[in-house]
């Protein structure tokens, strides 16, 4: 039995000018099926899950470090053999991750904005950083299932300018046998 699950989470949203209406965007979650495991995101057990990210006014992201619109997403894995007691979701670095901030780089036309990941406690998750490997990041396996909650929000790197926001991040869910 392989003790990891790998996948990619694609993010989409929109920064709108103050006079425009708010339209909806979303997070597309893609992940492979692992033999013997059922993987779902927000209850969707299809190959691609969808989590609403939404849109935000540029006014809410006027200054560097401003954050807006946190949206929760969950990763659930079922069918885990009982030998595994804990899991850890690690968001990988890569071409779409800002190595300095761990934020997800916008690949669309909105300016001065990244997507920031948050853990269940609301702390910033720096994709690609080993700072994710802390004891509070381990999620217990209960009755053969693990349920990991995260959030994603917009984060300004300067005065955000209108346009679409799109990025993605790869993740690996590791399964562990930890002594009590």
Task: Identify the meaning behind each predicted range.
Residues 1-180:
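Mature extracellular/passenger domains of Gram-negative fimbrial/pilin and adhesin proteins
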């Amino acid at each position: 039995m392989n003790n990891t699950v790998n996948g990619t989470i694609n993010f989409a949203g929109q920064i709108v000018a103050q006079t425009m209406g708010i339209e909806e965007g979303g997070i597309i979650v893609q992940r492979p099926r692992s033999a013997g495991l059922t993987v779902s995101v927000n209850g969707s057990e299809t190959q691609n899950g969808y989590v609403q990210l939404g849109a935000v006014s540029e006014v809410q992201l006027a200054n560097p470090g401003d954050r807006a619109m946190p949206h929760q997403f969950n990763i659930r894995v079922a069918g885990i053999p009982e030998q595994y007691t804990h899991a850890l979701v690690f968001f990988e670095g890569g071409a779409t991750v800002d190595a300095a901030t761990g934020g997800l780089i916008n690949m669309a036309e909105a300016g001065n904005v990244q997507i920031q990941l948050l853990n269940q406690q609301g702390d910033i998750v720096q994709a690609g950083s080993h700072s994710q490997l802390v004891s509070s990041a381990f999620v217990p396996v209960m009755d053969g299932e693990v349920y990991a909650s995260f959030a994603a929000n917009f984060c300004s790197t300067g005065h955000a300018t209108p346009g679409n926001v799109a990025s993605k991040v790869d993740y690996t869910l590791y399964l562990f046998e930890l002594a009590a």
